[in-house]
Protein backbone atom coordinates (compact mmCIF):
# COMPACT_ATOMS: atom_id res chain seq x y z
CA UNK A 1 0.00 0.00 0.00
CA UNK A 2 1.24 3.46 -0.84
CA UNK A 3 1.91 5.82 2.02
CA UNK A 4 1.87 9.61 2.28
CA UNK A 5 2.78 11.80 5.20
CA UNK A 6 0.39 14.67 5.80
CA UNK A 7 2.25 17.84 6.74
CA UNK A 8 -0.34 19.04 9.23
CA UNK A 9 -1.47 18.37 12.78
CA UNK A 10 -4.87 20.01 12.23
CA UNK A 11 -7.44 17.33 13.11
CA UNK A 12 -10.11 18.77 10.82
CA UNK A 13 -7.82 18.86 7.82
CA UNK A 14 -6.51 15.36 8.53
CA UNK A 15 -10.00 13.90 8.64
CA UNK A 16 -10.97 15.50 5.32
CA UNK A 17 -7.77 14.47 3.56
CA UNK A 18 -7.82 10.88 4.85
CA UNK A 19 -11.43 10.43 3.78
CA UNK A 20 -10.81 11.71 0.27
CA UNK A 21 -7.63 9.69 -0.33
CA UNK A 22 -9.09 6.44 1.01
CA UNK A 23 -10.53 5.33 -2.38
CA UNK A 24 -6.99 5.21 -3.79
CA UNK A 25 -5.84 2.83 -1.08
CA UNK A 26 -3.28 5.33 0.14
CA UNK A 27 -2.24 5.02 3.77
CA UNK A 28 -2.18 8.45 5.35
CA UNK A 29 0.15 9.05 8.27
CA UNK A 30 0.53 12.27 10.18
CA UNK A 31 3.85 13.96 10.63
CA UNK A 32 3.33 14.05 14.39
CA UNK A 33 2.97 10.24 14.49
CA UNK A 34 6.45 10.06 12.97
CA UNK A 35 7.92 12.55 15.41
CA UNK A 36 8.05 15.44 12.97
CA UNK A 37 7.30 18.91 14.29
CA UNK A 38 5.33 21.47 12.32
CA UNK A 39 7.30 23.59 9.87
CA UNK A 40 7.43 27.34 10.15
CA UNK A 41 5.09 29.30 7.87
CA UNK A 42 7.01 32.54 7.35
CA UNK A 43 5.89 33.31 3.82
CA UNK A 44 3.37 35.84 2.55
CA UNK A 45 1.72 33.49 0.04
CA UNK A 46 -0.24 30.29 0.52
CA UNK A 47 1.75 28.31 -2.04
CA UNK A 48 5.12 29.14 -0.49
CA UNK A 49 3.89 28.04 2.92
CA UNK A 50 2.47 24.79 1.52
CA UNK A 51 5.74 24.02 -0.27
CA UNK A 52 7.74 24.69 2.89
CA UNK A 53 5.52 22.36 4.93
CA UNK A 54 5.57 19.54 2.37
CA UNK A 55 9.32 19.71 1.90
CA UNK A 56 9.93 19.73 5.65
CA UNK A 57 7.78 16.63 6.17
CA UNK A 58 9.19 14.72 3.20
CA UNK A 59 12.83 15.41 4.07
CA UNK A 60 12.24 14.41 7.69
CA UNK A 61 10.44 11.13 6.91
CA UNK A 62 11.68 9.99 3.50
CA UNK A 63 8.06 9.70 2.38
CA UNK A 64 6.01 11.53 -0.22
CA UNK A 65 4.36 14.49 1.48
CA UNK A 66 1.06 16.27 1.03
CA UNK A 67 0.56 19.73 2.45
CA UNK A 68 -2.12 22.31 2.12
CA UNK A 69 -2.21 25.93 3.05
CA UNK A 70 -5.58 27.54 3.21
CA UNK A 71 -7.39 30.46 4.66
CA UNK A 72 -10.26 32.84 4.30
CA UNK A 73 -10.02 36.04 2.26
CA UNK A 74 -12.55 38.80 2.85
CA UNK A 75 -13.24 41.39 0.16
CA UNK A 76 -13.90 44.32 2.50
CA UNK A 77 -10.63 43.59 4.33
CA UNK A 78 -8.55 43.53 1.12
CA UNK A 79 -8.03 39.78 1.36
CA UNK A 80 -7.37 39.52 5.08
CA UNK A 81 -7.04 37.36 7.14
CA UNK A 82 -5.46 35.47 4.21
CA UNK A 83 -2.31 33.55 5.12
CA UNK A 84 -2.79 34.66 8.73
CA UNK A 85 -6.23 33.02 9.04
CA UNK A 86 -5.15 30.45 11.65
CA UNK A 87 -3.45 33.06 13.82
CA UNK A 88 -5.55 36.12 12.98
CA UNK A 89 -6.14 36.97 16.64
CA UNK A 90 -2.60 36.08 17.67
CA UNK A 91 -1.36 33.40 20.04
CA UNK A 92 -2.55 31.13 21.45
CA UNK A 93 -4.45 30.17 18.31
CA UNK A 94 -8.19 29.94 18.79
CA UNK A 95 -11.06 29.58 16.32
CA UNK A 96 -13.33 31.46 18.70
CA UNK A 97 -10.97 34.42 19.03
CA UNK A 98 -10.26 34.49 15.30
CA UNK A 99 -13.96 34.53 14.50
CA UNK A 100 -14.63 37.26 17.02
CA UNK A 101 -11.91 39.45 15.53
CA UNK A 102 -13.24 38.89 12.00
CA UNK A 103 -16.79 39.82 12.97
CA UNK A 104 -15.53 42.94 14.73
CA UNK A 105 -13.43 43.93 11.72
CA UNK A 106 -16.53 43.75 9.51
CA UNK A 107 -18.75 45.75 11.86
CA UNK A 108 -20.64 48.32 9.78
CA UNK A 109 -19.46 46.86 6.47
CA UNK A 110 -22.13 46.13 3.86
CA UNK A 111 -19.81 44.03 1.70
CA UNK A 112 -19.70 40.62 3.37
CA UNK A 113 -18.24 38.66 0.46
CA UNK A 114 -15.50 36.18 1.26
CA UNK A 115 -13.91 33.06 -0.08
CA UNK A 116 -11.97 30.18 1.32
CA UNK A 117 -8.79 29.46 -0.64
CA UNK A 118 -6.79 26.24 -0.65
CA UNK A 119 -3.56 25.23 -2.33
CA UNK A 120 -2.42 21.61 -2.14
CA UNK A 121 1.17 20.60 -2.76
CA UNK A 122 2.32 17.02 -3.34
CA UNK A 123 6.03 16.23 -3.22
CA UNK A 124 7.07 12.75 -4.33
CA UNK A 125 10.34 13.15 -2.42
CA UNK A 126 12.10 15.84 -0.46
CA UNK A 127 14.04 17.21 -3.44
CA UNK A 128 11.18 16.93 -5.94
CA UNK A 129 11.82 19.68 -8.53
CA UNK A 130 8.31 19.47 -9.99
CA UNK A 131 5.77 19.49 -7.16
CA UNK A 132 2.13 18.96 -7.97
CA UNK A 133 0.25 22.17 -7.11
CA UNK A 134 -3.55 22.41 -7.14
CA UNK A 135 -5.65 25.42 -6.11
CA UNK A 136 -9.36 25.97 -5.54
CA UNK A 137 -11.79 28.36 -3.87
CA UNK A 138 -15.16 28.34 -2.11
CA UNK A 139 -17.23 31.52 -2.14
CA UNK A 140 -19.70 32.76 0.43
CA UNK A 141 -20.44 35.57 2.86
CA UNK A 142 -19.50 36.35 6.45
CA UNK A 143 -22.37 36.54 8.94
CA UNK A 144 -22.17 38.11 12.38
CA UNK A 145 -23.71 35.30 14.43
CA UNK A 146 -22.32 31.75 14.29
CA UNK A 147 -24.63 28.99 13.06
CA UNK A 148 -23.93 25.25 13.11
CA UNK A 149 -21.83 22.84 15.14
CA UNK A 150 -19.74 21.16 12.45
CA UNK A 151 -16.57 22.05 10.63
CA UNK A 152 -13.78 24.13 12.06
CA UNK A 153 -12.11 27.49 11.59
CA UNK A 154 -14.46 30.14 10.26
CA UNK A 155 -17.14 27.66 9.15
CA UNK A 156 -19.89 28.84 11.58
CA UNK A 157 -19.66 32.36 10.10
CA UNK A 158 -19.21 31.31 6.45
CA UNK A 159 -22.68 31.50 4.91
CA UNK A 160 -23.50 29.88 1.57
CA UNK A 161 -26.38 31.83 -0.05
CA UNK A 162 -27.15 29.15 -2.63
CA UNK A 163 -27.67 26.58 0.14
CA UNK A 164 -29.13 28.86 2.80
CA UNK A 165 -26.79 27.51 5.46
CA UNK A 166 -23.29 27.90 6.82
CA UNK A 167 -20.35 25.61 6.22
CA UNK A 168 -20.72 24.45 9.83
CA UNK A 169 -24.20 23.09 9.03
CA UNK A 170 -22.98 20.78 6.27
CA UNK A 171 -22.34 17.09 6.69
CA UNK A 172 -18.78 15.93 6.09
CA UNK A 173 -19.91 14.41 2.79
CA UNK A 174 -21.56 17.65 1.65
CA UNK A 175 -18.55 19.71 2.63
CA UNK A 176 -16.09 17.41 0.87
CA UNK A 177 -18.05 17.80 -2.38
CA UNK A 178 -18.11 21.58 -2.48
CA UNK A 179 -15.42 23.01 -0.22
CA UNK A 180 -12.18 24.57 -1.42
CA UNK A 181 -10.13 21.70 0.04
CA UNK A 182 -12.60 19.05 -1.07
CA UNK A 183 -12.56 20.25 -4.68
CA UNK A 184 -8.77 20.55 -4.76
CA UNK A 185 -8.32 17.09 -3.27
CA UNK A 186 -10.86 15.61 -5.69
CA UNK A 187 -8.79 16.97 -8.56
CA UNK A 188 -5.64 15.49 -7.01
CA UNK A 189 -7.33 12.10 -6.58
CA UNK A 190 -8.46 12.18 -10.22
CA UNK A 191 -4.95 13.10 -11.34
CA UNK A 192 -3.40 10.25 -9.36
CA UNK A 193 -6.00 7.71 -10.49
CA UNK A 194 -5.41 8.65 -14.13
CA UNK A 195 -1.64 8.39 -13.67
CA UNK A 196 -1.14 11.95 -14.83
CA UNK A 197 1.75 12.24 -12.42
CA UNK A 198 4.47 10.00 -11.05
CA UNK A 199 2.90 7.27 -8.87
CA UNK A 200 3.02 8.02 -5.18
CA UNK A 201 5.43 5.49 -3.70
CA UNK A 202 7.85 5.62 -0.80
CA UNK A 203 11.36 6.71 -1.76
UniProtKB/Swiss-Prot annotation:
CDD domains: HAM1. GO terms for cellular component: cytosol. InterPro entries: dITP/XTP_pyrophosphatase, ITPase-like_fam, RdgB/HAM1. Its EC number is 3.6.1.66. GO terms for biological process: nucleotide metabolic process; purine nucleoside triphosphate catabolic process. It catalyses: XTP + H2O = XMP + diphosphate + H(+); dITP + H2O = dIMP + diphosphate + H(+); ITP + H2O = IMP + diphosphate + H(+). Binds 1 Mg(2+) ion per subunit. It is an enzyme of class 3 (hydrolase). It holds the Pfam family Ham1p_like. Keywords: Hydrolase, Magnesium, Metal-binding, Nucleotide metabolism, Nucleotide-binding. Pyrophosphatase that catalyzes the hydrolysis of nucleoside triphosphates to their monophosphate derivatives, with a high preference for the non-canonical purine nucleotides XTP (xanthosine triphosphate), dITP (deoxyinosine triphosphate) and ITP. Seems to function as a house-cleaning enzyme that removes non-canonical purine nucleotides from the nucleotide pool, thus preventing their incorporation into DNA/RNA and avoiding chromosomal lesions. Homodimer. This is dITP/XTP pyrophosphatase. It comes from Nitrosomonas europaea (strain ATCC 19718 / CIP 103999 / KCTC 2705 / NBRC 14298).
